Regions:
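Hydrophobic faces of well-ordered beta-strands that scaffold small-molecule active sites
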Residues: 7-9, 48-50, 71-75, 98-100, ...
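Flexible mid-to-C-terminal extensions adjoining Fe-S/redox cofactors in radical SAM and related proteins
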Residues: 235-285
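Conserved alpha-helical substructure of the radical SAM core
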Residues: 1-93
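Short coil/loop residues immediately preceding or within conserved phosphate-binding loops
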Residues: 6, 226-227
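Short cysteine clusters
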Residues: 15, 19-22, 223, 241, ...
Length: 285
């Protein structure tokens, strides 16, 4: 991978599912032609990642993926479950890796797309030869289940899990669900244990940076929000991170030829997660 900074274009706020923990905190969607113009403007200077609330609410967006050489897609899986012919469209546009949400232990509590349907969708993706990563959010109700979560996914034939920390953003306003620092450390210990248990080539145990720096086991976390990583919303507002899409965190507004590196004055401790510290741990929230 080159050393160019990253731009994530959030294509849409639309979703076909209801999740009580949804972090999306913006509205609107891009026209495909406008995204093409934005990609052509930025791709020489930045690596570009395409994301959204649920990209498959507008399958035309898939035509954009070859333009940025992106082979992975994040989804809740519902559109694929309801319309399996999307499998062919994914392949036609170069998608080889699919990350799908499955919040083991709490899924049917937090998502209207039932866990049994998610499992059927995962089976379809695996049988269609996609590399499947399961995205699992951890809160107070399931953070102690990490060993069970890993064992279940291994038995299912999944090769990778990505654990995400509950961040108090968007619909995530239940502060009683937030993991405190001791619970985060407990989760990190369990993740480390699972990495010791499984060969990474057989089952890769990963986690997002939203747990913060792991001082117990060492890690290479470097939060690049607003310095080497930026997010453009459908309304063209520029944010440092997908979890920091609200007014007090805006960096500016996208315009053709905009140099985010020179216009950003966003400063923070690179060795901690800015969203975690300011949305979960900040006592002013």
């Amino acid at each position: 991978m080159n050393n160019k900074p990253w731009i994530t274009i959030m294509l849409t706020s639309k979703c076909n599912n209801y999740c009580s923990h949804c972090y999306i905190n913006y509205d609107g969607e891009w026209d495909v032609s406008e995204v093409v113009e934005c990609i052509n403007d930025l791709k020489g200077t930045y690596n570009i990642n395409l994301d959204g609330a649920e990209i498959l609410t507008k399958p035309e967006y898939l035509s954009l993926f070859p333009l940025v050489d992106q082979h992975h897609l994040m989804t809740n899986g519902k559109a694929i479950y309801e319309n399996p012919s999307l499998i062919d469209l994914l392949k036609q546009n170069g998608i080889t890796d699919v990350s799908i949400s499955y919040h083991y232990g709490i899924h049917d509590e937090v998502s209207s797309f039932r866990s049994s349907c998610v499992e059927q969708t995962i089976e379809l993706l695996l049988s269609s030869n996609f590399n499947v990563t399961v995205m699992t959010m951890l809160n107070k109700k399931n953070f102690l289940l990490i060993p069970d979560i890993c064992d279940f996914f291994v038995s299912f034939g999944i090769k990778k899990v990505m654990f995400a920390n509950y961040i108090c953003q968007g619909k995530n306003k239940d502060r009683n669900s937030i993991l405190d620092k001791n619970e985060v450390n407990c989760a990190l210990n369990s993740i480390h244990s699972m990495r010791q248990k499984y060969e990474s080539s057989d089952f890769y145990v990963s986690r997002t940076g939203a747990f913060g720096f792991d001082s117990m086991h060492g890690c290479n976390l470097c939060c690049d929000a607003g310095t080497e990583g930026f997010v453009i919303l459908p309304n063209r507002k520029v944010c440092p991170c997908v979890f920091l899409c609200e007014n007090n965190f805006f960096i500016g507004e996208y315009a053709k030829g905009c140099d985010f590196l020179s216009c950003s004055t966003f400063a923070h401790d690179f060795y901690s997660c800015f969203a975690l510290e300011n949305l979960n741990y900040c006592t002013d929230k």
